[in-house]
């Protein structure tokens, strides 16, 4: 309303100016400008001006207002963070305890930055708007040669029909192209010659000359260059020491300051820190500082070890479980030979003598021997399993013989089951020889095979005899 009233007032001022004499016209004009400025200043609020505009202007104004409100909220959030940080600083400002602050090397910003959004999100792109097209429905008039000739009589036109002379110059590249933008493009590289004016096409193979063998021989006969002075006059050059431009930092002289070791009640200085002189390398090597280790927290609490005390004496740990009893030897084992039975008997006698030497341990019950039940139970279980002559032990020599016999029997069975003529015969002869020599089983063990019976019926070969002289004479005759 104020804007409308201002316009009406200006109309009345204009009508008053027309009725006034011409001498006061400048004065009224200056007063009208001052009043207009005062009215515009009293409006103040931009929304009233926007509301008076067209709908497009009001829509743009509302979008700008929303953007301003959003920016104002962001500024308010930043102000809250600043006030919070200021409060933390004020809280630790008066304390005298040392505080370690580990700042993050990463800027406190989200991992994915938010893209800037335009305030005209709902506006339609003017490039996509469709504009009305008007199609003119008219046909082109045909060319009238007669009318053209009549007009040429009144309007003389000089048209040159002579063709333009072509540029047949041998030098230069011809006319300038349209895409050249600088003068340097016209010149040859590192020269002042204009390529489009003075440029001659040269054939690189036109002046090629092939060298003959005579010319090559003449070149090789040329003398060598003179030797350097260091060889001809045998002079030695002094080796120049290269200058070192590397900077080596130095500690220099540190002034001695006589100050007390402890300064109490200093404002802004922590009183719970102690600095110890480092005896390692100095500051001259300029080694990078080590990263401090941050404290780690564990949620699991380790339980303390509980020790049982009985009458002020520590109880020993529980004894280990006894081992399983030794497996009994099969009854089908062959009897021991007399050579191996003797040492076993001697060992049994020694065990009997040792058992008679300690009758208390042998006859006493298990609980009386050792009430703690540690190593005694283990030894007792070994004794009961056959430690004192109860076990049917065999010597190592007997075990080796048994294993060897088992391997030979398995080989004979494997070869006899195959049914091959030559293999069966060979194996049977081997077994027969072993039986004769006494190293293996006899021929009457009954092994299977195709020629087992035939080989059994073959008599042994007679011993070789010396031929007599009569036989030799008969053979010669």
Swiss-Prot record:
A Gene Ontology BP annotation from the UniProt entry: endocytic recycling
Location of the region described as Disordered in the Swiss-Prot/TrEMBL record: 310-420, 434-477
Protein name (record): Putative WAS protein family homolog 4
Regions of compositional bias (Pro residues) in chain numbering: 315-327
Taxonomic source organism: Homo sapiens (Human)
Name of the gene this protein is made from: WASH4P
Note: WASH genes duplicated to multiple chromosomal ends during primate evolution, with highest copy number reached in humans, whose WASH repertoires probably vary extensively among individuals. It is therefore difficult to determine which gene is functional or not. The telomeric region of chromosome 9p is paralogous to the pericentromeric regions of chromosome 9 as well as to 2q. Paralogous regions contain 7 transcriptional units. Duplicated WASH genes are also present in the Xq/Yq pseudoautosomal region, as well as on chromosome 1 and 15. The chromosome 16 copy seems to be a pseudogene.
Subunit structure: Interacts (via WHD1 region) with WASHC2C; the interaction is direct.
Keyword line: Actin-binding, Endosome, Membrane, Transport
PANTHER family per the UniProt record, alphabetical: CXYORF1, WAS PROTEIN FAMILY HOMOLOG 4-RELATED
GO cellular component entries: cytosol; early endosome; early endosome membrane; recycling endosome; recycling endosome membrane; WASH complex
Keyword Transport on entry: yes
Biased composition regions of type Basic and acidic residues, renumbered to the chain: 395-411
Domain WH2: 374-396
Subcellular location: Early endosome membrane; Recycling endosome membrane
UniProt-annotated stretches for the region WHD1: 1-180
Segments for region (VCA): 362-477
Family under the similarity heading: Belongs to the WASH1 family.
MF terms (GO), sorted A to Z: actin binding; alpha-tubulin binding; gamma-tubulin binding
Protein purpose: May act as a nucleation-promoting factor at the surface of endosomes, where it recruits and activates the Arp2/3 complex to induce actin polymerization, playing a key role in the fission of tubules that serve as transport intermediates during endosome sorting.
Gly residues bias: start-end ranges: 437-449
């Amino acid at each position: 309303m104020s804007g409308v009233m201002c316009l009406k007032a200006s109309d009345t001022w204009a009508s008053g100016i027309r009725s006034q004499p011409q001498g006061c016209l400048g004065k009224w004009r200056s007063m009208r400008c001052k009043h207009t400025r005062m009215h515009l200043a009293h409006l103040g609020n931009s929304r009233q001006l926007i509301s008076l505009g067209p709908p497009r202007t009001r829509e743009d104004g509302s979008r700008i207002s929303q953007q301003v409100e959003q920016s104002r909220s962001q500024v308010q959030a930043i102000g809250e963070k600043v006030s919070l940080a200021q409060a933390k600083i004020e809280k630790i400002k008066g304390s005298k305890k040392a505080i370690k602050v580990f700042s993050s090397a990463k800027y406190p910003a989200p991992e994915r930055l938010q893209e800037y959004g335009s305030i005209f999100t709902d506006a339609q792109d003017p490039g996509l708007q469709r504009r009305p097209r008007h199609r003119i429905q008219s046909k082109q008039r045909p060319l009238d040669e007669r009318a053209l000739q009549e007009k040429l009589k009144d309007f003389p036109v000089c048209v040159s029909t002579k063709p333009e002379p072509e540029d047949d110059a041998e030098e230069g590249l011809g006319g300038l192209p349209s895409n050249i933008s600088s003068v340097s493009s016209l010149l040859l590289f590192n020269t002042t010659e204009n390529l489009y004016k003075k440029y001659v096409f040269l054939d690189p193979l036109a002046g090629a000359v092939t060298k003959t063998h005579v010319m090559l021989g003449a070149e090789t006969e040329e003398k060598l260059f003179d030797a350097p002075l260091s060889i001809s006059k045998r002079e030695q050059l002094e080796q120049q020491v290269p200058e070192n431009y590397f900077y080596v930092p130095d500690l220099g002289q540190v002034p001695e300051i006589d100050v007390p070791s402890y300064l109490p009640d200093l404002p802004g200085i922590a009183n719970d820190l102690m600095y110890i002189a480092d005896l390692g390398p100095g500051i001259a090597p300029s080694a990078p500082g080590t990263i401090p280790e941050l404290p780690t927290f564990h949620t699991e609490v380790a339980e303390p070890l509980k020790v049982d005390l009985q009458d002020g004496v520590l109880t020993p740990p529980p004894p280990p479980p006894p081992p399983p009893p030794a497996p009994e030897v099969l009854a089908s084992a062959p009897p021991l030979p007399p050579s191996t039975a003797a040492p076993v008997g001697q060992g049994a006698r020694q065990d009997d003598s040792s058992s008679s030497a300690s009758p208390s341990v042998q006859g006493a019950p298990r609980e009386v021997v050792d009430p703690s039940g540690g190593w005694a139970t283990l030894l007792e279980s070994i004794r009961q399993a056959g430690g004192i002559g109860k076990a049917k032990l065999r010597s190592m020599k007997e075990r080796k013989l048994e294993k060897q016999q088992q391997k030979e029997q398995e080989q004979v069975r494997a070869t006899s089951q195959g049914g091959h003529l030559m293999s069966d015969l060979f194996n049977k002869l081997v077994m027969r020889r072993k039986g004769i020599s006494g190293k293996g089983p006899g021929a009457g063990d009954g092994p299977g095979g195709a020629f087992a019976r035939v080989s059994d019926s073959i008599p042994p070969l007679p011993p070789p005899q010396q031929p007599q002289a009569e036989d030799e004479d008969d053979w010669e005759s």
